[in-house]
């Protein structure tokens, strides 16, 4: 866990109620000794990378901060095209309360707070006893993997317990030292699991804005078309488009098959017509339809699709 690190940063100096909320975010490596039977590919591992964040806030800020986190999660899911997910309110196991920090009153208070927020936002959710963290209840976003596993992708956790144990304080309106509330959030959760789910969802056809190489260029004959291919490559790069130029001495059909298998969003084939007319002919990895455009038209098309995050 990297929670302690963020707490020590907060504790480094005394804060006023006017300073809150304070949000600290980081990309961190985490380690968890998962049972060998639970380890699965990069969906569930013993070492993983997480985009973690902690929000230190006043009690009256809990609802607005949690709503803000939920809105951010939904914005991110929209960009990635995720639609099949569920909200889960993760509660403590009332039959085994000894494994949780804190008293019944604080647990009921925090569970009811998250329940009320979910109801007020209008999102459908279900409740799951025994799925809470040891320090507090959570709103988890659950997704179903390709092999049927129900996994948590994003999480928002409400924590009254650890501020007490770490003796975190701020000065309230009455000039008294009081405890803040901590909201743990992970928008993408484990980056490893997120990437696994993204690849399953897209079948490897990453959206244009996210693809490592957005355009692959294939000159038909290096002797006649490579110079123009390099001009196209340079122009695309100047416009911030990630491009690969396949200038290997291989047959066009071979390079085309490799490009399709590599799932490049756009594949350009440049021959005599394109070189003479300063145009490009493209196809995608998912369609055999060929389209010819002027070079400027293609650049503007790609830039617009990247800007709008067209899938």
Predicted regions and their residues:
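NTP/phosphate- and nucleic-acid-binding module
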Residues: 1-311
């Amino acid at each position: 866990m990297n929670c302690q690190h963020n707490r020590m940063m907060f504790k480094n100096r005394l804060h006023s109620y006017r300073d809150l909320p304070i949000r600290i975010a980081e990309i961190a490596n985490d380690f968890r000794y998962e049972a060998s039977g639970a380890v699965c590919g990069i969906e569930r591992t013993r070492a993983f990378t997480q985009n973690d964040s902690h929000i230190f806030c006043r009690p009256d800020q809990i609802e607005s901060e949690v709503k803000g986190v939920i809105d951010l999660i939904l914005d991110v899911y929209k960009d990635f095209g995720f639609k099949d997910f569920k909200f889960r309110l993760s509660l403590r196991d009332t039959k085994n309360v000894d494994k949780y920090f804190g008293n019944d009153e604080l647990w009921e208070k925090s569970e009811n707070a998250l329940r009320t927020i979910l109801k007020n936002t209008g999102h459908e959710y279900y409740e799951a006893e025994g799925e809470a963290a040891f320090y507090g209840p959570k709103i988890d976003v659950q997704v179903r993997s390709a092999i049927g596993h129900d996994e948590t992708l994003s999480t928002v956790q409400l924590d009254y317990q650890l501020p007490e144990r770490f003796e975190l304080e701020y000065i309230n309106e009455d000039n008294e030292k009081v405890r803040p509330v901590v909201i743990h959030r992970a928008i993408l959760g484990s980056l490893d699991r997120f990437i696994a789910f993204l690849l399953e969802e897209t079948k490897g056809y990453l959206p244009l804005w996210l693809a490592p190489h957005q355009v692959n260029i294939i000159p038909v004959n290096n002797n006649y078309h490579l110079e123009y291919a390099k001009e196209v490559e340079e122009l695309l790069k100047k416009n911030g488009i990630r491009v690969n130029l396949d200038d290997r001495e291989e047959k066009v059909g071979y390079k085309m098959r490799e490009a399709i298998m590599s799932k490049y969003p756009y594949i350009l084939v440049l021959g005599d017509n394109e070189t003479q007319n300063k145009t490009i002919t493209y196809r995608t990895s998912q369609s055999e339809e060929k389209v010819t455009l002027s070079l400027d038209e293609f650049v503007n098309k790609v830039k617009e699709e990247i800007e709008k995050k067209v899938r």
